[in-house]
Amino acid sequence: MTFAAPMSSKEARQMIRNNEWVKPTAGVANGYTQANLVVLPKELAFEFLLFCQRNPKPCPVLDVTEPGSWEPSMVAPGADLRVDLPKYRVYRNGELTEERTDIIDLWDKDMVGFLLGCSFTFEHALVNNGIPVRHIQENCNVPMYKTNIPCVKAGRFEGPMVVSMRPIPHKDVVRAVQVTSRFPSVHGAPIHIGDPKLIGIHDIYKPDFGDPVTIREGETPVFWACGVTPQAVAMEVKPDIMITHAPGHMFITDLRDEQLGVL
């Protein structure tokens, strides 16, 4: 099944809730802000919120639920974070133990949900500026990589920054920086342009998360901070349980992309 266009955020979430869409959400419900998900027990919530505050590039906070509540009331009233994402990951003691399409049985009265800004949000703006987005063109997930850039520690939370990569034609790199800089609450400007080895990526065609994409002659790899960073942190910190979105399978909010733009 494919999404019809145009589609509202609520319509997209309903299809996802009905398991009619279990694929990555890049290009889905264009114009609506997408978000990364992290779910943790209440006892870890403050430390993780502090981690996000100290690392706003990879972890820009859009909403935080009340303990036990699965409704992100600020960005999508009435939504249910237990069922409204296409695919979830469950980490136990730092190990990825399963992927599933709902987390109803895992969300108890102590769970707190965090929604973090996602770079899929500014892809609509890139396309509107005539800048190609390769993983959308190739109908796959965006490539994501662990880097040698350390995040600022907060309590128990520490680990490497994860970045997403999009190949950009040389002539459009400056424009891509300008366009994405307008969206600081969804990662904003790139954190690196060019040689991936400088940030600890040794094989650009072997991403740690997502899928490899074609890099054509005349294109430069451009890297943005990525909301998959908490998953890399989970592998380092090893909390008893951390639930996240599966990379590329995002939560679609009711916010419009341009609501998060500046200038």
UniProtKB/Swiss-Prot annotation:
Origin superkingdom: Bacteria
Family named by the database record: Belongs to the D-glutamate cyclase family.
Protein name: Putative hydro-lyase GK2103
InterPro entries in the cross-refs: D-Glu_cyclase, Putative_hydro-lyase, UPF0317
One Pfam entry name: D-Glu_cyclase
Record GO terms (molecular function): lyase activity
Enzyme class: lyase
Key words, A-Z: Lyase
Known EC number: 4.2.1.-
Lineage: Bacteria, Bacillati, Bacillota, Bacilli, Bacillales
